[in-house]
Amino acid sequence: LREDHPQRKADHIRISLEEDVSFETVTAGFERYRFVHCALPEISLAAVDTTVSFLGRRLEAPLLVSSMTGGTPQGREVNCRLARAAQEVGIGMGLGSLRAALEDPTLLETYRVRDVAPDILLLANLGAVQLNYGYTVDHCRRAVEMVEADGLILHLNPLQEALQPEGQTDFSGLLRKIEEVCRGLEVPVIVKEVGWGLSADVARLLADAGVAALDVAGAGGTSWSQVEMYRAQNGLQRAVAAAFRDWGIPTAEAVREVRCAVPHLPIIASGGIRDGIQVAKAIALGATLCGIARPLLVAATESDQAVVEVTTAIITQLRVAMFAVGAPDLSALARTPLVEESPLSYRWRGMRASTRSPSASSSASSRTVGSR
């Protein structure tokens, strides 16, 4: 274990809570999309159903507490508060990277939450790059077993590793090793980015490798280049990290691209999702679940109840949005079209962009997307 690992985790929490770690000009992109209001929904608000099945588990709402922390005393308290809230509300939870606990068993208790959340969908988490630094399928299995998880998240964070003074940056041949983990584990494997987004091309590769789901983790929420800028040890490191503040694929665009690339794979939308209307838009664009991190981290520094209140507000907003578009359940919401207010259509592959002439549509400033 690198001796700085617990301190790095503590730094990440402190910086995320105390500093401006937002993107400067990039947003998650959901403001570009608008639902068509339905004045005659023909359903009862009380009958709106937000439940969803994900990896064989039933959730009361399409929400996941995104992987955040562990490995520190504060991480233990935060994880327990998040888990108790997830248990009460009926949503899933991802843990922070378990690498620290694998290499220092005394840290395991900072991750264990099954005693306070026996029924939740719980996902273990490791950095995929560790498969190039001695980790094997057995390490992945141990990570799952030690926290009694229902699945494993492998996170991809090449840019973050490149910006960390202690980063591990050999990502060569990693796809084959991810495939080996998918074949070798008895539980589902989810692959996620950490805030810069998954492209369509990467999504196809991962789908072919056998992953059970993808978390696009797009740009627009916490900028981890900003976090690493605050951790930088010299001027050069700060300058390099600062240059990448607005790097990445916005979450809304990542969801659209990945859904088109892998039509049948469950998708988690995360990165800058802050309310239930954005959750509704993400589902209409192709997501199965939405992951939320920083708003719940802030709440978890206060109490279990604060996390419950934030989560309940998001779920209530989602239910009202579904009612306002006449969607009785999430399947209907997924088929609900959105109006794209910008005429600019990004194609992330090759960084091409295209615009339509006014003659291509009755409106040059909007178009309908997302119906499936």
Predicted regions and their residues:
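Alpha/beta enzyme core
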Residues: A83-R84, E88, D115-L122, A128-A269, ...
